[in-house]
């Protein structure tokens, strides 16, 4: 982490020319998740002989999904304003994503170091466009 100190704290050190950062969140659960999903999870916890995979790891690789969505957003922006140098990050570079999310209004850093949001809790991924 020390080797990337300046790159973490100064976006332009990581991607030269960066003036702004777009920060986004993607919820763990798909939109069509039944409202009683928590009840099902509690029932699963009552069966100690059954292995349980964490909710965030049950779907497709979030790195690929969120990166693709952010790239689509960057492409739409470029279609409106013209080409701009950018990079998309999803947990893949020395980026202070929790700090960026806090500053952008997505949430705040909880005592457990995750970003918290009043409705979503901490059940979401973060990604950035530099």
Annotate each predicted stretch with a short phrase.
Residues 1-130:
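Auxiliary alpha/beta "docking" domains used to position bulky ligands
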């Amino acid at each position: 982490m020390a080797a990337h100190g300046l790159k973490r704290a100064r976006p332009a050190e990581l991607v030269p020319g960066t003036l702004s950062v777009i920060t986004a969140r993607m919820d763990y659960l798909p939109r069509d998740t039944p409202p009683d999903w928590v009840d099902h999870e509690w029932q699963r916890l009552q069966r100690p002989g059954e292995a349980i995979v964490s909710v965030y790891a049950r779907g497709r690789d979030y790195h690929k999904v969120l990166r693709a969505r952010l790239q689509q957003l960057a492409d739409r922006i470029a279609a409106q304003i013209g080409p701009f140098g950018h990079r998309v990050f999803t947990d893949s570079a020395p980026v202070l994503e929790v700090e960026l999310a806090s500053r952008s209004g997505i949430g705040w850093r909880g005592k457990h170091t995750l970003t918290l949001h009043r409705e979503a809790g901490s059940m979401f991924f973060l990604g950035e466009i530099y």
